């Protein structure tokens, strides 16, 4: 904890500098700079407040120890001991909270995401489950105040998706949904099953952060652009014109379709932004082999034996295999109630980081 405390002293000094800057008329008049500084100040506020409370409690404990060692009044000594008992519990709690707040932040946590869901092993049933997962994430996004926009989809005749990609925008989307990367297994009786037998199918989920601005130039010759009539929201007007846009990056085969915006030009701009983000993510791994290996690590091959989570419909049970968490409320989870699972995953990975930090500081 000593190393963490040394870092905190520097952090508090920087926090106080930020507060002074926010009161500077020159900064106040520069909206962009003021917003950047105020966001940094807000991000640091909780840990600074907890550290100040921690220091205040430590001082009170020391003062009480002095009373205990020097005071002759038994009642005062007893009162000081009782206070210290409570303060020591509070200090231990604050230490744990501060350690978590001081863990290295994932630089992508504040970013929006591109989520790709694919029906994998299991044929039609896998594609139906891919659609169920999409609806689950859409409902969860609604509870968080996030927006979901369709990028591209490959629907199946039975009503599911062979593949569907969406963009989810809002506050700290990646920080919560990054744990959804992987193979999701479903066990249920398909609607086409006449014997009532339970089948096992799989869908894979890939979650990629959306980069607002990426340092990549795409050769226009490498991009095929198709326009078509939108079938989504927007009223009659949007269906009368070919406002929807599909862009294909020919060297990588990456496809982005956008129809959420009001005009073709807006759809083009948004599609290009997303395409750049996805192509950038692709080339980050230098070549296709590394990209495929990275994606396989993230989502698995889709084989039934690989999974991060199992959704068992007959028993209304969902199990996250990474942390051994089982909940007997699958119906509520599929209705978007994901917080209990996501919070448990966050705690699990925070605990792992804390253990690593303790080893490094030992």
UniProtKB/Swiss-Prot annotation:
Query: SUPFAM superfamilies per the record?
Result: Release factor (SSF75620)
GO terms of molecular function: translation release factor activity, codon specific
Q: How is it modified after translation?
A: Methylated by PrmC. Methylation increases the termination efficiency of RF1.
Q: Which UniProt keywords apply?
A: Cytoplasm, Methylation, Protein biosynthesis
Where this protein primarily resides, as one coarse class? Answer: cytoplasm
InterPro entries per record: PCRF, Pep_chain_release_fac_I, Pep_chain_release_fac_I_sf, Prokaryotic/Mito_RF, RF-1
One GO term of the cellular component aspect? cytoplasm
Compartments reported by the entry:
Cytoplasm
The answer to whether UniProt assigns keyword Protein biosynthesis to this entry is yes
Tell whether Protein biosynthesis is among the UniProt keywords: yes
Modified positions (N5-methylglutamine) in chain numbering: 236
A Pfam family this protein belongs to?
PCRF
NCBIfam families hit by this protein: prfA (TIGR00019), PRK00591.1 (NF001859)
Query: What the protein does?
Result: Peptide chain release factor 1 directs the termination of translation in response to the peptide chain termination codons UAG and UAA.
Q: What family does the entry list?
A: Belongs to the prokaryotic/mitochondrial release factor family.
Record's protein name: Peptide chain release factor 1
Organism for this UniProt entry: Lactobacillus gasseri (strain ATCC 33323 / DSM 20243 / BCRC 14619 / CIP 102991 / JCM 1131 / KCTC 3163 / NCIMB 11718 / NCTC 13722 / AM63)
